[in-house]
């Protein structure tokens, strides 16, 4: 272990350098004409659009905190970005809506929709891993359940939820499109679709929970070190960081076309 530490540290240092070099591509407030705006939160839907709830009084705008995250993004943006990136529109609504919600809740975080989408791609192929699909209602079907963390090829993590979240009362398993551990979901689980419950298998709930988790600790994700710290808190390892980074950069580039 000691002999490998310098290599691992060098890898992380190199990755941080890459993040700092491409931060304009991956994260909000980019200055690059090629990707300007691609990594920032998408346009917000107007109150008059059919997908948004009716205002309480004439001319009033709905409170974004009370609107399901999937209804927050502009429909035309979703259609165009889904076509250019290949991310299914229903799932893209969850990523983009969660980024918009965090723009209101924690504006200093500056979370790009493409960072959420990159994690979703790496963790579950946008909810399609092992033959699962995300339904029009936003639910992964069949439910996405990760491997048992039994100490084999993965770290050992004994059951923390009596199997209530992951169906395994011996070992913990990551669940849902964003692959939350039961103990993490217990703390960060969110209700993104406004149905009164937090469901890790629902892409809106999972995306909003992931957004809040990444932004905690007053991080500014336009800063390379903060971005790396956020991804590290989600899943450690320079290889994982590099995969998420590549996905985030690719999605931003595709969306800008």
Where are these regions (language model features)?
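N-terminal export signals and maturation junctions of secreted/periplasmic proteins
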Residues: 27-103
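Hydrophobic single-pass membrane-targeting/anchoring helices
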Residues: 2-38
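Compositionally biased, intrinsically disordered low-complexity regions
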Residues: 13-19, 39, 61, 140, ...
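Catalytic glycan-binding domains that act on GlcNAc-containing polysaccharides
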Residues: 71-257
């Amino acid at each position: 272990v000691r002999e490998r530490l310098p290599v691992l540290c060098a890898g992380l240092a190199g990755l941080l350098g890459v993040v700092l070099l491409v931060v304009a591509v991956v994260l909000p407030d980019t200055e690059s004409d090629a990707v300007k705006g691609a990594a920032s939160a998408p346009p917000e839907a107007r109150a008059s659009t059919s997908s948004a709830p009716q205002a309480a009084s004439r001319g009033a705008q709905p409170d974004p905190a009370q609107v399901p995250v999937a209804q927050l993004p502009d429909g035309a943006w979703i259609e165009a970005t889904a076509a250019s990136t290949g991310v299914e529109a229903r799932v893209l609504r969850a990523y983009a809506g969660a980024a918009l919600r965090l723009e209101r809740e924690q504006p200093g975080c500056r979370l790009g929709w493409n960072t959420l989408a990159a994690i979703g791609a790496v963790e579950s192929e946008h909810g399609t891993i092992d033959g699962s699909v995300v339904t029009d209602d936003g639910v992964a079907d069949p439910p996405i359940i990760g491997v048992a963390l039994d100490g084999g090829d993965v770290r050992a993590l004994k059951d923390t939820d009596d199997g209530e979240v992951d169906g395994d009362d011996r070992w913990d398993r990551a669940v849902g499109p964003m692959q939350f551990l039961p103990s993490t979901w217990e703390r960060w689980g969110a209700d993104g679709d406004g149905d009164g419950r937090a469901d890790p298998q629902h892409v809106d709930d999972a995306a909003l929970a992931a957004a809040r988790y990444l932004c905690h600790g007053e991080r500014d994700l336009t800063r390379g070190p903060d971005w790396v710290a956020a991804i590290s808190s989600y899943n450690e390892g320079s290889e994982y960081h590099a995969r998420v980074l590549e996905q985030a950069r690719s999605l931003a580039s595709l969306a800008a076309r």
